[in-house]
């Protein structure tokens, strides 16, 4: 049985993990009888957004606690991940990836990724273990791995940010994936595009299948 780590960033696309992207990822992994462990940072979100009005709320919310809503409580803090214990890593998107797992949403090409997440991503990369990234999450890979290699990923139709981060960006529709065989990366744009839910699901399904295929070639 394969073991896959999934990192999420809260609950809700405006300030946390994109719920559809996360659920589609978990569903497709379950279809392949994969042992999944879900992780999230144990710290407060950058901010909290009312998903009905899309306005900021005057409250604080812990990322791990919020993420537990999607994980049905079966979740661990980010510092529990050890790359050696898993066959692959997958990162769904949402604004949480741009604000809680990085500061891309604030600094664009000048963004950084927290040291703990950097070490996790580099750990999987150094062990040649495949990494899947969805929506805005491929930009995290570009930030973290730019001092190690030049990667190929996608954010969908517009990849200017990826190019500014020193990576190669490929145009891709929601139902397809971009594969970087050399660096063992698989990406799909999902909600970076205004596409039907069925197409987004198809793209994530393809990503999961390709990541699992890569696991057998480690």
Q: Which residues are covered by each model-predicted region?
A:
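Short, well-ordered helical secondary-structure segments
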Residues: 57, 65-68, 121, 173
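Active-site-adjacent pocket-lining segments in enzyme domains
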Residues: 5-31, 35-37, 74-76, 80-218
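Glycine/small-residue-rich loop that forms an oxyanion/phosphate-binding "nest" at active or ligand-binding sites
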Residues: 60-74, 82-84
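A short, charged/proline- and glycine-enriched loop
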Residues: 1-2
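N-terminal beta-loop-helix "entrance" segment that forms/cooperates
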Residues: 39-64
């Amino acid at each position: 049985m394969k073991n896959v780590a999934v990192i999420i960033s809260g609950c809700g696309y405006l300030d946390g993990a994109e719920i559809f992207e996360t659920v589609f990822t978990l569903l497709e992994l379950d279809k392949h009888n994969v042992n999944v462990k879900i992780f999230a940072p144990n710290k407060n979100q950058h901010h909290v957004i009312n998903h009905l009005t899309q306005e900021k709320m005057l409250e604080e919310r812990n990322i791990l606690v919020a993420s537990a809503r999607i994980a049905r409580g079966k979740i661990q803090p980010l510092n529990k991940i050890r790359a050696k214990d898993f066959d692959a890593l997958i990162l769904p998107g949402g604004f949480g990836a741009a604000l809680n797992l990085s500061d891309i949403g604030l600094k664009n090409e000048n963004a950084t990724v927290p040291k703990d997440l950097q070490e996790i991503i580099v750990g999987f990369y150094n062990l040649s273990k495949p990494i899947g990234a969805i929506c805005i999450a491929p930009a995290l890979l570009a930030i973290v791995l730019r001092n190690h290699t030049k990667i190929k990923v996608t954010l969908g139709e517009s990849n200017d940010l990826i190019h500014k981060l020193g990576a190669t960006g490929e145009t891709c529709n929601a139902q397809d994936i971009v594969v970087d065989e050399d660096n063992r990366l698989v990406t799909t744009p999902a909600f970076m595009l205004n596409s039907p839910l069925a197409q987004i699901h198809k793209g994530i399904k393809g990503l999961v299948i390709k990541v699992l295929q890569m696991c057998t070639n480690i």
